[in-house]
């Protein structure tokens, strides 16, 4: 005959089940597990807020830890870490106005090697001729800049006034240039005419004077006579001259 497990009913079955669960619980648990349950690690983090202008941030971390594997009762231990400090090396673009200017300057010099008309020797040449030529070029550029600024000043008065002002300025500039050219031409013409008259007079004198003798005027003749006679008693008056 087959054997069957005994059947339990009522309180007897409940008691047997409770004892069976307690026996299983004792097999799977140990004293170390109970000690680990009592071990507590807590980490407290404290953030210190500084003013916005300060580039330094600091934080302290406190760790309280009890003994885990020791058999003695756990005692609270506090470990204090050194503050973590971080420095902000670079300023934002908004706070550094020279960043954009510096980049544009570097790009200008990097891209200007082929377009530049000045060589290294020419720039470092300190002779008078080179300095004079460079000053002339600078003067020319400054004159152009002054002209453009004058045009902008006139143009800033308004659309209609700007158009009329620019036209009047150009007309006035043209008239001034024409007047200067005309005066220079007249002065040159007068000089040419004066030179032509002197040349004609010299030609006429040379045509009339065919001899090599030198003629003295009346005053020179009187002085010559006095010197030849060597007469100191002979006084001269202003009328003789």
UniProtKB/Swiss-Prot annotation:
<comment type="similarity">
    <text>Belongs to the pneumoviridae phosphoprotein P family.</text>
</comment>
<feature type="region of interest" description="Binding to RNA-directed RNA polymerase L">
    <location>
        <begin position="216"/>
        <end position="232"/>
    </location>
</feature>
<feature type="modified residue" description="Phosphoserine; by host">
    <location>
        <position position="116"/>
    </location>
</feature>
<keyword id="KW-1035">Host cytoplasm</keyword>
<keyword id="KW-0946">Virion</keyword>
<feature type="site" description="Interaction with protein M2-1">
    <location>
        <position position="108"/>
    </location>
</feature>
<feature type="region of interest" description="Binding to protein M2-1">
    <location>
        <begin position="90"/>
        <end position="110"/>
    </location>
</feature>
<feature type="region of interest" description="Important for viral particle assembly">
    <location>
        <begin position="39"/>
        <end position="57"/>
    </location>
</feature>
<feature type="modified residue" description="Phosphothreonine; by host">
    <location>
        <position position="108"/>
    </location>
</feature>
<feature type="region of interest" description="Binding to the N-RNA complex">
    <location>
        <begin position="232"/>
        <end position="241"/>
    </location>
</feature>
<dbReference type="GO" id="GO:0030430">
    <property type="term" value="C:host cell cytoplasm"/>
</dbReference>
<protein>
    <recommendedName>
        <fullName>Phosphoprotein</fullName>
    </recommendedName>
</protein>
<dbReference type="Pfam" id="PF02478">
    <property type="entry name" value="Pneumo_phosprot"/>
</dbReference>
<feature type="compositionally biased region" description="Polar residues">
    <location>
        <begin position="55"/>
        <end position="78"/>
    </location>
</feature>
<dbReference type="InterPro" id="IPR003487">
    <property type="entry name" value="Pprotein_pneumovir"/>
</dbReference>
<feature type="compositionally biased region" description="Acidic residues">
    <location>
        <begin position="227"/>
        <end position="241"/>
    </location>
</feature>
<feature type="modified residue" description="Phosphoserine; by host">
    <location>
        <position position="119"/>
    </location>
</feature>
<comment type="subunit">
    <text>Homotetramer. Interacts with protein M2-1; the interaction between the two tetramers is required for the anti-termination and elongation transcriptional activities of protein M2-1. Interacts with host phosphatase PP1; this interaction recruits PP1 to the inclusion bodies. Formation of a complex PP1/M2-1/P allows P to target host PP1 phosphatase to the M2-1 substrate. Interacts (via C-terminus) with the nucleoprotein N (via N-terminus); the phosphorylated phosphoprotein P binds to N-RNA complex. Interacts (via N-terminus) with the monomeric RNA-free nucleoprotein N.</text>
</comment>
<feature type="compositionally biased region" description="Basic and acidic residues">
    <location>
        <begin position="202"/>
        <end position="211"/>
    </location>
</feature>
<feature type="region of interest" description="Disordered">
    <location>
        <begin position="51"/>
        <end position="78"/>
    </location>
</feature>
<dbReference type="GO" id="GO:0003968">
    <property type="term" value="F:RNA-directed RNA polymerase activity"/>
</dbReference>
<keyword id="KW-0597">Phosphoprotein</keyword>
<feature type="region of interest" description="Oligomerization and binding to RNA-directed RNA polymerase L">
    <location>
        <begin position="120"/>
        <end position="160"/>
    </location>
</feature>
<feature type="modified residue" description="Phosphoserine; by host">
    <location>
        <position position="232"/>
    </location>
</feature>
<feature type="compositionally biased region" description="Polar residues">
    <location>
        <begin position="213"/>
        <end position="223"/>
    </location>
</feature>
<dbReference type="GO" id="GO:0044423">
    <property type="term" value="C:virion component"/>
</dbReference>
<keyword id="KW-0693">Viral RNA replication</keyword>
<feature type="modified residue" description="Phosphoserine; by host">
    <location>
        <position position="237"/>
    </location>
</feature>
<feature type="modified residue" description="Phosphoserine; by host">
    <location>
        <position position="117"/>
    </location>
</feature>
<feature type="region of interest" description="Disordered">
    <location>
        <begin position="202"/>
        <end position="241"/>
    </location>
</feature>
<comment type="function">
    <text>Plays critical roles in regulating RNA replication and transcription through its interactions with multiple proteins. Tethers the RNA-directed RNA polymerase L to the nucleoprotein-RNA complex. Recruits the M2-1 protein, a processivity factor that is required for efficient transcription of viral RNA. Acts as a chaperone for neo-synthesized nucleoprotein by forming an N-P complex that preserves N in a monomeric and RNA-free state and prevents the association of nascent N with host cell RNAs. Recruits the host phosphatase PP1 to inclusion bodies to regulate viral transcription.</text>
</comment>
<feature type="region of interest" description="Binding to monomeric RNA-free nucleoprotein">
    <location>
        <begin position="1"/>
        <end position="30"/>
    </location>
</feature>
<feature type="region of interest" description="Binding to host phosphatase PP1">
    <location>
        <begin position="81"/>
        <end position="87"/>
    </location>
</feature>
């Amino acid at each position: 005959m087959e054997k069957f497990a005994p059947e339990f009913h009522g309180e007897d079955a409940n008691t047997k089940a409770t004892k069976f669960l307690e026996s299983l619980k004792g097999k799977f648990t140990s004293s170390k597990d109970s000690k680990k349950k009592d071990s507590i690690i807590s980490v407290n983090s404290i953030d210190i807020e500084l003013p916005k202008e300060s580039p330094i941030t600091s934080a302290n971390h406190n760790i309280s830890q009890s003994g885990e594997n020791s058999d003695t009762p756990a005692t609270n231990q506090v470990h204090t870490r050194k503050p973590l400090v971080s420095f902000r090396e670079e300023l934002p673009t908004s706070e550094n106005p020279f960043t954009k200017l510096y980049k544009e300057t570097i790009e200008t010099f990097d891209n200007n090697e082929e377009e530049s008309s000045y060589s290294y020797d020419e720039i470092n040449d300190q002779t008078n001729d080179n300095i004079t030529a460079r000053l002339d070029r600078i003067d020319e550029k400054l004159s152009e800049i002054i002209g453009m600024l004058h045009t902008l000043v006139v143009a800033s008065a308004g659309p209609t006034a700007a158009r009329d002002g620019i036209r009047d300025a150009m007309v006035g500039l043209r008239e001034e240039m024409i007047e200067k050219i005309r005066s220079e031409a007249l002065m040159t013409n007068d000089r040419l005419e004066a030179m032509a008259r002197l040349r004609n007079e010299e030609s006429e004198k040379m045509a009339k004077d065919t001899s090599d003798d030198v003629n003295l005027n009346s005053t020179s003749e009187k002085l010559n006579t006095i010197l030849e006679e060597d007469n100191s008693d002979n006084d001269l008056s202003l009328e003789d001259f």
